[in-house]
Amino acid sequence: MGLTSNNIVIAAAVAALLLFAVTIWLWPRLAGRGVAPVLGRVGMLLGTQLTVFVAFGLFANQSFGFYGSWSDLFGTQDEPGVVVDHDTPGTRVRVTETRHLAVDGGSSPRVAGRIEKVNIQGPVSGIASPAYIYLPPEYFRPEYARRTFPAALVLTGYPGTTEALINGLKYPQTSHRLVKAGRMQPLVLVMMRPTVAPPRDTECVDVPGGPRVETFFTQDLPKAVADHYRVGERARNWGVIGNSTGGYCALKMAMRHPDAFSAAAGLSPSYEAPIDATTGDLFGGSERLERENDLMWRLDHMPAPPVSLLVSSSEHGERNYRDTVRFVNKVKRLNRRGEPTRISSIILSTGGHNFHTWKREVPAALEWLGGRLGDR
């Protein structure tokens, strides 16, 4: 059973309940004095607590998407992505599965759209990675047959699971609801983890001598998707949104590559790449590369890109609040000088660095993003 499957969560919960019941039933028999009864009571208590802990842990992981598989959890997934043979012809997007959207009328693509699981190959970066692509119902309707749709890359945090974007943050369901209410134009959503070279947290950097993750997201992915689907290939057709690490990636890639993305939304983002055990040395010892991936430094020292940015935080509960205010103020000063970067924000009064907070922000952020992309 997979780490995020319903079956394993249910099995763990049932095991915890059964062991609790067995403990209650056997407790009178273990009430005597002596080494054996004491060890029996200790063993029953530890066993019950362990199964309850495991059940809650599995449920939390399924809900929040910390780890996507057993190999993720135990750190044994060390495949650095799939190397692409550049001389092999053929499509760069391969559909491996389709599924319905969990809304009314979800069995009909013309009513609810469709989610496709795909594998995206990057000929420039040499990386291949799985993704889920949400195609809105308009994509399947005859009157839209000649229309090109705008698209948004949607990123999780680290390590994250792509399924959490569907089942936890509910991006496709939210997009469907907003379009149906007339608050947003139809978008094609490309939902992914930023961890395309697991288990390493690359922070969407082209690591010297390592995986070229930034190249994959800014060059390979838009072209591959546009070649396979009716999606525009220009920057004005593409936006990017993400939470936590995915939020940093979103902002950075738009600021560094305005020719790829014209709008970016970072939910609870950081503003520079951390260097720790999960990242390793991302910049090959280069202080220049490290500075260029620091978003605050870029605002102070690099030309302002013609992009629209959205950031989010909470006055109480988020550690990035002060940095978010600094970032917003820096962009506002650029605006007053006539620079082309635009800034918007979502600031909650309270909210932690978690899915509950991001679910409150996703509808407004998605509506904002859809309003800044073009379909031609």
What are these regions (language model features)?
Residues 1-376:
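Non-catalytic cap/lid and distal C-terminal segments of serine-dependent acyl enzymes
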